[in-house]
A protein has these predicted regions:
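Short beta-strand to alpha-helix junction loop
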Residues: 91-92, 138-157, 212, 292-293
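Predominantly flavin-linked oxidoreductase catalytic cores and closely associated redox partners
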Residues: 161-301
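Helix-loop-beta segment of a Rossmann-like dinucleotide-binding subdomain
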Residues: 129-148, 185, 283-288
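N-terminal FAD cofactor-binding segment of flavoenzymes
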Residues: 57, 77-126
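C-terminal helical "tail/cap" subdomain of flavin- and related membrane-associated enzymes
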Residues: 376-498
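FAD/FMN-dependent oxidoreductases across multiple families
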Residues: 289-403
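Extreme N-terminal leader/targeting segments of oxidoreductases
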Residues: 1-42, 60-62, 73
Length: 498
């Protein structure tokens, strides 16, 4: 059955679509006259992952979708100024993969054909939790692993293959037009300094952490939104490596997690195998335990500061392909727009503009995809321009947003100074139960699957309160705790550790 977003799109790899894409984009940017009335025009602010998926969501419903982007978007996988986080590790959990595939059928295959890795969870994961090493249970879910540049270019190519979608690159958003009752368009400044208004029947803010929506709403006469922040003080340091030759294909994810029960800062690390035989390695630490931005301290931190030296041992045998990229932009921040007493028609906020998470949990990409799918489905169900549609969408996207928010802040709130008042009694009770579940999951495959049901964003946290899960948590793990990383002898040999 066709969906509103899949009609008029074509598939193909970024390399296949690169030729001619710049010409198509240029024609779209130049031709802004003689188009449909504003009532059937959608404007998406931001051309990153969530913005492009929102454009795909609306392409089958609007006559024209205009993506307004501050950067000039590349026609192939390449860095850009407005996405510094692309230098760090990213993963797309299966809950987000399914949503993205619904919006852009076949895009997962296009990604894997271009070199992205589909890693089964927890089969291809070597994870040290606070309670010990997880076993590598049979596949329950999966993650897509790829450099952010490849992921974005693949999605962008698919979306822009639809002639109803156009990009205004090098364009700054100045504000919204309309009033407290309804948004009617956006004011922009183009690359030549010219300011103008784009009238629209729907506006989506997907501009990320730097979103101007709180200010734009007050400019329209609406109250400031409720906001909550949980800041663990996490600092991120990432570096790209070429894996040893025999470990360039099929090597597992490596994750050394912090123990939030221990006093002092938390330190952790990820090693993600991505395209072209590379490993992207991200090390992080909370206040007082931050990694250094210095290249020559990267391996030392991984070996000596994490709870196990495995990542440091692995990268000491790999070839560095980049210097260290460093950031402190990791605060959890959520705007509760769904709670506002009034909400303007024709306006929706998605992605990091709505809620930004500590990236260590890897949920931002998945939530963006799920939210774009909600936008498509509700617009299709209730009809373009229907009364109350934007408020319905804003309330509905709070569901996937809230699931990821609870997962992130439920851990981070325990670090010193993370929130104004510290963890609540509820936070402590939930954390104690989750800790017991994680302990049980080290030696119980069924409970490990229930946990990954939630972390993959495929099911809600209520599944963890089922009677069978409660009983299993009371019993604890059925197998003894592993004392060493569950790498096979062959994997150790391929990584030159044996």
């Amino acid at each position: 059955m066709s969906t509103p977003s899949s009609r008029g799109t074509t598939s193909g790899s970024p390399a296949e679509k690169q030729v001619g894409e710049g010409d198509r984009r240029g024609r779209r940017e130049a031709d802004l006259s003689g188009r449909p009335s504003p009532a059937k025009v959608a404007v998406v602010l931001g051309g990153s992952h969530t913005g492009m998926l929102a454009a795909a969501a609306l392409a089958g419903l609007a006559d024209r979708v205009v993506v307004v982007e501050r950067d000039e978007l590349p026609g192939e996988p390449a860095p850009r100024k407005g996405l510094p986080q692309a230098r760090h590790a990213h993963m797309l959990w299966s809950g987000g993969v399914r949503a993205m595939e619904d919006l852009l059928p076949g895009v997962t295959g296009t990604l894997t054909d271009a070199g992205a890795r589909r890693a089964p969870v927890t089969t291809d994961m070597v994870v040290l939790s606070a309670h010990g090493w997880f076993r590598r249970w049979p596949e329950s879910h999966h993650v897509i692993l790829a450099g952010r540049d490849l992921l974005d270019a693949t999605v962008r190519t698919r979306v822009l293959a639809d002639d109803r979608v156009e990009v205004l690159g090098g364009t700054e958003v100045l504000g919204l037009t309309g009033d407290a009752r309804a948004v009617t368009g956006v004011r922009v400044r183009e690359r030549d300094g010219r300011e103008r208004t784009i009238d629209a029947g729907m506006v989506v803010d997907a501009t990320g952490r730097a979103s101007g929506t709180p200010r734009w709403l007050t400019d329209l006469g609406l109250p400031a939104p409720e906001r909550r922040e949980v800041d663990s003080g996490l600092a991120y340091a990432s570096r790209l490596y070429l894996a040893p030759e025999q470990a360039r294909d099929g090597f597992p994810v490596i994750n050394v997690q912090p123990d939030t029960r221990a006093a002092g800062p938390g330190r952790a690390g990820f090693l993600l195998p991505i395209e072209d035989g590379r490993w992207i390695v991200t090390l992080n630490g909370t206040r007082g335990g931050e990694p250094s931005p210095a290249d020559d301290d990267f391996v030392r931190f991984a070996r000596e500061e994490l709870r196990h030296p495995l990542i440091g041992d692995l990268i000491s045998r790999a070839e560095p392909l980049s210097g260290v990229s460093f950031t402190r932009t990791t605060v959890n921040r959520r705007y509760f727009y769904e709670r506002m007493p009034a909400w303007p028609e024709n306006f929706t906020v998605l992605g990091d503009a709505l809620a930004a998470y500590n990236p260590v949990y890897g949920h931002g990409l998945a939530v963006g995809a799920q939210s774009a799918l909600v936008l498509r489905d509700l617009t299709w169900r209730y009809g373009w321009g229907s009364a109350g549609l934007s408020r319905r969408v804003q309330k509905a996207v709070a569901r996937p947003v809230g699931a990821a928010w609870e997962l992130a802040t439920g851990q981070d709130v325990f670090y010193p100074g993370a929130s104004e008042n510290g963890p609540t009694a509820r936070d402590r009770a939930v954390a104690a139960y989750v800790s017991r579940l994680m302990y049980t999951a080290t030696g119980n495959g069924r409970i490990a699957r229930r946990v990954t049901d939630v972390t993959s964003l495929e099911r809600r946290a209520e599944v963890l309160l089922a009677p069978g899960v409660l009983l299993a948590a009371a019993v604890g793990p059925l197998k003894p705790t592993l004392t060493e990383p569950p790498l096979t002898a062959e994997e150790l040999k391929r990584a030159e550790l044996r």
